[in-house]
Design a protein with these regions (language model features):
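Conserved redox-active cysteine motifs that mediate thiol-disulfide chemistry
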Residues: 52-53, 60-77, 81, 86-96
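Alpha/beta-hydrolase fold active-site loops
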Residues: 54-56, 112, 162
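Short, internal strand/loop/helix patches
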Residues: 115, 120-169
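Thiol-/selenol-based redox modules, centered on thioredoxin-like
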Residues: 160-190
Length: 190
């Protein structure tokens, strides 16, 4: 009886510690809250939680990944583009889009924030790439450490390439790698 109780207590401790580790290192799943992301932007630390209540286009890039660099350049031009989604009367139109997590409608006053996160180990490399690619430095963020970059890559399943995600106002992941038309519609609200 005593051995059984010790065994049960040991299993409870084991499962409790395993579930805590899973919570700390959970992966992004559609329709669920995104993993924690904290980045540095112009000397300040910013948490993804600070964007609660807003739609977020979360884009990861690295200086050594030409595809993600081209995506950043394309996204920057879409954000700076003055075009908006308008209906025939010239008023801002509602945006409707479908994702694997559900169907969404963004009203006329919906704001979309863009968070571009660089995963380079070197801040100097990022700064040089921002300069070379003519990106606006104030819109670019970076991870604080190589360990953070590794954790984020794992949490967002980016082992085979960097990606862009759409997060709803409740902090749930609703879309990965949106096509250009969806991205243009979303970014017309930024």
């Amino acid at each position: 009886m005593k051995k059984t109780m010790i065994l049960i207590a040991g299993l409870v401790v084991l499962f409790t510690s395993v579930s805590a580790a899973v919570d700390d290192h959970r992966t992004a799943r559609f329709g669920e809250e995104t993993p924690a992301v904290v980045v540095e932007q112009q000397g300040s630390r910013i948490s993804l939680d600070a964007y609660r209540g807003k739609w977020v286009v979360l884009s990861f890039w690295a200086s050594t990944d030409p595809v993600s660099r081209m995506d950043q350049t394309r996204m920057a031009s879409m954000v700076s583009d003055d075009s908006t989604a308008c209906d025939k009367s010239g008023n801002d139109a509602e945006i409707e889009f479908r994702t694997s997590a559900g169907n969404y409608t963004l009203g006329n006053n919906t704001q979309v924030e863009v968070l571009s996160v660089n995963l380079d180990k070197s801040p100097e490399m990022m700064a040089e790439t921002v300069r070379l690619d003519n990106l606006q430095g104030s819109t670019q963020s970076r991870v604080a450490s190589a360990a953070d970059a590794e954790r984020i890559c794992k949490a967002f399943a980016m082992e085979k390439g960097l990606r862009t995600f759409v997060i709803d106002p409740e902090g749930r992941l609703v879309m990965a790698d949106p096509d250009e038309a969806s991205l243009r519609l979303l970014l017309s609200r930024s």
